[in-house]
Amino acid sequence: MKKIIILGGGGFIGGHLGKRLMDDGCHVRIADIKNHEFWDHSEICHEFIKCDLTDPKSVELVISENCDELYQLAADMGGAGYIFTGENDANVMHNSALINLNVAKECFVKKVKKVFYSSSACMYPEHNQLDPDNPNCIESSAYPANPDSEYGWEKLFSERLFLAFNRNYKLNTRIARFHNIFGPQGTWDG
């Protein structure tokens, strides 16, 4: 049985991912600072650890040495109503960067077999996203960097962090840039 850890599993994407992986027969551990708003823990994971991933000791506790796959979805995100006002930029950048610094280091230390980092299309330059019918969101358009928000800058930084751990320490990392994810069990406020 695959051993999976989902960081940020109390959120929209993490809850759906946990449910799917449990249905596929995986053992799922979720860590988040909050409970899932819509699902009971037993519906999305075998183990739920409520903790603050900005704390390195919490990350050390959550990430086990026998982890087959780790999905890093955790961020100080709080929903679109939180990240795009500009009022929370310092917290978004500081807290999310701390989470990712802690996670990358601990994944290397514990020799996690595969790491998935959830980035965002917000890391693309703002001018690439102005035409909603034809966003220029391809790899060659990512630089020169000019993300549309501090959230986007932090996502870009953390992409570079995980890629550096992949390059320097052989941390098997995959990255996806999500764009406007919504659906059942989603929330505007996070």
Where does each model-flagged region fall?
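Rossmann-fold NAD(P)-dependent oxidoreductase module
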Residues: 16, 20, 106, 161
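Conserved Rossmann-fold NAD(P)-dependent oxidoreductase catalytic core, especially the SDR/UDP-sugar
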Residues: 101-148
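SDR active-site strand-loop-helix element
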Residues: 7, 31, 70-76, 115-121, ...
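NAD(P)H-binding glycine-rich loop region in Rossmannoid oxidoreductase-like domains
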Residues: 53-95, 106
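N-terminal Rossmann/SDR dinucleotide-binding element
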Residues: 1-69
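Glycine-rich NAD(P)-binding loop of the Rossmann-fold in SDR/ketoreductase-type enzymes
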Residues: 69, 91-102, 110, 149, ...
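Active-site Tyr-X1-5-Lys
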Residues: 126, 146-174
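Flexible, glycine-rich beta-alpha linker
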Residues: 123-125, 149-150, 171-190
